[in-house]
């Protein structure tokens, strides 16, 4: 009897110790961040050093997740997810690299599975992703003293906005910021009121501003990026105006569809017209472009949500605008 009690006591103590150690290890794993002073923890580090302006580019979502895997694991540098990470950056880098020295950190971004959770439940995983991005950004600010473009698409845009909320009012950041291209995520009037140092672009060449838009068909009235009842702030990349006037496809200097090696596989000038929706603030694409031809691909989007094509539809306009704003910075 006594032996049995002692045995159960020891088993209970061991169980508590195991749970304690498991929790400690889990917390340590979550808290551990990459050493961004090590160039191996960057997808791009000082690529194109001769440029007068930098670009700090943040990768969009590339991992599907599942089975409780809500943040990208960076342990295996040869994994398919890490190759997709660099590939996704390559798909959009051509917008920026003609004008900028390129920096892009690896980070524990959230997976697509996170966006299937209720919005409040996403935040712990997004905070972990952001903890890496902010650490990388602080290292970048110490390593380079050049002016910079901050850029990101989708989750990358969300991370850009978070960076500006936290650091954008700091004199050094405000002085060095050429513009922030936060494409494919919302930013609302409420956020601008809460962070008055955030300024939306009003034209083609203003400096220190946020460039943002979310593309969708005329029929869409809700999306993951801009839920129903929410109005986002934006600018039309065809005219660089913030009014609701329609801009014809004649303003479109070229849609470019790129691959993971940064090659342009297809280019089409005068691709589409667009206007900013008065109620949603989203960028409505004219009916020449159809959801059948440009499907949402991912099940977190509905037909007519052109999120995956945001920068591809307006590639040449964006590329030209980056050059324009970086030039305007020096004037």
Task: Please describe what each predicted stretch is.
Residues 1-8:
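N-terminal secretory signal peptides that target proteins for export/translocation
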Residues 159-163:
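Hydrolases whose catalytic domains are alpha/beta-hydrolase-1, hotdog thioesterase
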Residues 12-23:
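Bacterial N-terminal signal peptides
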Residues 129-143, 166-315, 319-328:
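Surface cap/lid and interfacial helix-loop subdomains adjacent to catalytic sites
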Residues 28-82:
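N-terminal low-complexity, Ser/Thr- and acidic-residue-enriched intrinsically disordered segments
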Residues 58-147, 290-331:
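Active-site catalytic motif of lipid deacylating hydrolases and related acyltransferases
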Residues 54-58, 103-106, 149, 179-182, ...:
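Structural recognition of the beta-strand scaffold that forms the well-ordered cores
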Residues 152-156:
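Gly/Ala-rich beta-loop-alpha elbow adjacent to hydrolase catalytic centers
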């Amino acid at each position: 009897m006594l032996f049995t009690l002692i045995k159960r006591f020891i088993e209970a103590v061991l169980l508590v110790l195991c749970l304690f150690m498991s929790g400690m290890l889990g917390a340590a794993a979550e808290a551990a961040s990459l050493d961004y002073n090590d160039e191996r923890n960057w997808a791009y580090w000082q690529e194109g050093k001769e440029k007068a302006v930098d670009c700090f580019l943040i990768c969009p979502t590339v991992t599907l997740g599942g089975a409780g895997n809500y943040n990208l694991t960076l342990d295996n540098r040869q994994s398919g997810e890490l190759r997709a990470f660099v590939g996704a950056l390559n798909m959009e880098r051509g917008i920026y690299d003609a004008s900028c020295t390129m920096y892009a950190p690896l980070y524990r971004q959230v997976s697509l599975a996170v966006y299937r959770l209720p919005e409040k439940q996403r935040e712990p995983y997004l905070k972990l992703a952001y903890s890496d991005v902010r650490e990388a950004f602080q290292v970048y600010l110490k390593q380079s003293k050049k002016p910079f473009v901050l850029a990101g698409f989708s989750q990358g845009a969300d991370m850009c906005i978070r960076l500006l909320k936290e650091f954008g009012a700091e004199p050094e950041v405000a002085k060095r910021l050429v513009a922030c291209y936060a494409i494919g995520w919302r930013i609302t009037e409420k956020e601008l009121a809460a962070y008055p140092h955030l300024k939306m672009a009003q034209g083609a060449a203003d400096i220190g501003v946020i460039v943002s838009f979310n593309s969708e068909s005329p029929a869409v009235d809700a999306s993951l990026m801009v839920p129903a009842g929410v109005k986002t702030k934006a600018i039309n990349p065809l005219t660089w105006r913030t009014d609701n006037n329609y801009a014809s496809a004649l303003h479109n200097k070229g849609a470019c569809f790129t691959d993971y090696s940064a090659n342009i596989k297809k280019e089409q000038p005068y691709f589409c017209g667009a206007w900013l929706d008065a109620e949603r603030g989203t960028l409505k694409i004219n009916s020449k472009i159809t959801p059948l031809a440009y499907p949402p691909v991912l099940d977190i989007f509905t037909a007519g949500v052109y999120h995956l094509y945001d920068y591809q539809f307006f590639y040449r306009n964006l590329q030209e605008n980056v050059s324009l704003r970086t030039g305007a910075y020096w004037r």
